[in-house]
């Protein structure tokens, strides 16, 4: 049986999860892959931090990346450091040295994925990245392999566990955004600086990677229109329940004859849709294809062992390719023109919450403004906040986003409108 040597770059949460699975399941992994996978080197800045971890006799810590790159016996470099600068240098150098790479680095792939895939192909090595999106959910290989014969028309998902935890808590317990964010930070679900999660940036990077595979285009993070959850209020969630919706931060990529739309935003999801029941820190991705019809994949989107499981899966696959001298067969998957569809033209139904004067005749004025924008009202609820102020919650018919922006301006021009408090898209069932 052939032995394939690997090197781990970084030894943080995901890397240690990968290490533990490789050690704990060594017999299973060897029998299933037909290859002995041997950890040879672990690149770290300070080995003294890891004195409590017992390495196998084959492995050693190194502090110079050249000790990995120049070691011809190492066939696979597993990049688990994160970041887009030094990590990119390491991945690029490894590929040029004829080493296959496994990475969980979504930021790097969203920024430089097409270049790195081309580089891997030119050097006849593999670049695998299952763990870069949705952690333990095996969605990457599913898209380019299991669903390779399908024309994907739409993918929509809950791609960030932190925001789903926050919104689930706000929904289930009626807590404010600020209170739940603090709890998420205390539990380790959210970083001290939660910007990447709560502003939708993390989900946008994942969507860029998934859309690249699904629609065969060079999609970058900058192509995704992004809106976060920081303005979501418990009052909106309460109205949403009344209308039959749960609030979720979704990433959605959809192809039509007009082009490809790429968006991350908070949306009301109908309770009849499977994504509405995804709670806590779990992730899910819902796919529509012309062969599979509809399918949903659900699981842990982060964590040491769930993400490590996806990393090990890639290591096993690449190790088999190394053993049979068949690396570099994975051709870059983008061959169609990008043609991104303007966000202003995307049609959705919308929920709007307004604070207005509690007087007769106000609704008639709203009806006039709605008619001017050719927007119909599907549902409306009024709650009297105090003798002078009423709160209106409106669900509109489907219309382009540009129409809603014009409607907001029209509402703001009315003296009877005190505030357009929130505007939230409604996902189709």
Question: What do these predicted regions represent?
Answer:
Residues 179-277, 282-284, 303:
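Substrate-binding/catalytic subdomain of NAD(P)-dependent oxidoreductase enzymes
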Residues 310, 315-429:
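A conserved regulatory-domain signal marking ACT and ACT-like small-molecule sensing domains
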Residues 15-16:
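N-terminal Rossmann-fold NAD(P) dinucleotide-binding loop
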Residues 87-93, 97, 106-144:
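Rossmann-fold NAD(P)-binding glycine/threonine-rich loop
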Residues 74, 121-202, 209:
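Rossmann-like NAD(P)H-binding beta-loop-alpha module
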Residues 25-53:
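NAD(P)-binding Rossmann-fold cofactor-contacting core
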Residues 63-104:
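Rossmann-fold NAD(P) dinucleotide-binding segment
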Residues 11:
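Glycine-rich Rossmann-fold phosphate-binding loop(s) that bind the pyrophosphate
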């Amino acid at each position: 049986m052939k032995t394939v040597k690997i090197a781990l770059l970084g030894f943080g949460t995901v890397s240690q999860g990968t290490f533990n699975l490789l050690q704990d399941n060594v017999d299973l992994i060897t029998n299933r892959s037909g290859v002995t996978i041997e950890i040879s080197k672990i690149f770290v800045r300070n080995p003294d931090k890891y004195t409590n971890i017992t390495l196998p006799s084959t492995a050693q810590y190194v502090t110079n990346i050249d000790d990995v790159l120049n070691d011809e016996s190492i066939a696979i470099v597993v990049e688990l450091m994160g970041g887009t600068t030094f990590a990119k240098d390491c991945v690029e150098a490894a590929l040029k040295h004829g080493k296959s790479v496994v990475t969980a680095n979504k930021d790097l792939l969203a920024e430089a994925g097409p270049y790195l895939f081309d580089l891997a192909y030119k050097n006849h090595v593999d670049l695998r990245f299952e763990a870069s999106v949705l952690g333990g959910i095996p969605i990457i290989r599913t898209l380019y392999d299991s669903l390779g014969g399908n024309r994907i028309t739409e993918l929509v998902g809950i791609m960030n566990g932190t925001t789903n935890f926050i919104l689930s808590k706000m929904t289930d317990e009626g807590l404010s955004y600020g209170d739940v964010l603090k709890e998420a930070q205390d539990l380790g679900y959210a970083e001290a600086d939660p910007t990447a999660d709560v502003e939708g940036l993390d989900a946008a990077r994942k969507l860029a990677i998934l859309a690249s595979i699904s629609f065969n285009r060079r999609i970058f993070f900058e192509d995704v229109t992004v809106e976060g959850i920081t303005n979501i209020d418990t009052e909106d969630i309460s109205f949403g329940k009344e209308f039959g919706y749960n609030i979720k931060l979704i990433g959605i990529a959809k192809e039509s004859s007009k082009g490809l739309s790429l968006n991350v935003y908070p949306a009301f999801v109908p309770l009849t849709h499977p994504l509405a029941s995804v709670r806590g820190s779990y992730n899910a991705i819902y796919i529509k294809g012309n062969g599979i019809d509809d399918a949903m994949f659900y699981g842990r989107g982060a964590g040491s062992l769930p993400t490590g499981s996806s990393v090990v899966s890639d290591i096993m696959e690449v190790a088999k390719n190394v053993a049979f001298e068949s690396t570099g067969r994975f051709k870059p998957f983008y061959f169609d023109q990008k043609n991104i569809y303007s966000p202003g033209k995307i049609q959705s139904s919308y929920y709007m919450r307004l604070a207005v004067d509690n007087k007769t005749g106000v609704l008639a004025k709203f009806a006039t403004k709605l008619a001017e924008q050719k927007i119909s009202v599907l549902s409306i609820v009024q709650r009297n906040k105090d003798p002078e102020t009423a709160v209106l919650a409106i669900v509109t018919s489907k219309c382009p986003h540009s129409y809603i922006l014009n409607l907001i301006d029209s509402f703001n021009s009315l003296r009877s409108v005190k505030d357009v408090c929130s505007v939230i898209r409604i996902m189709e069932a």
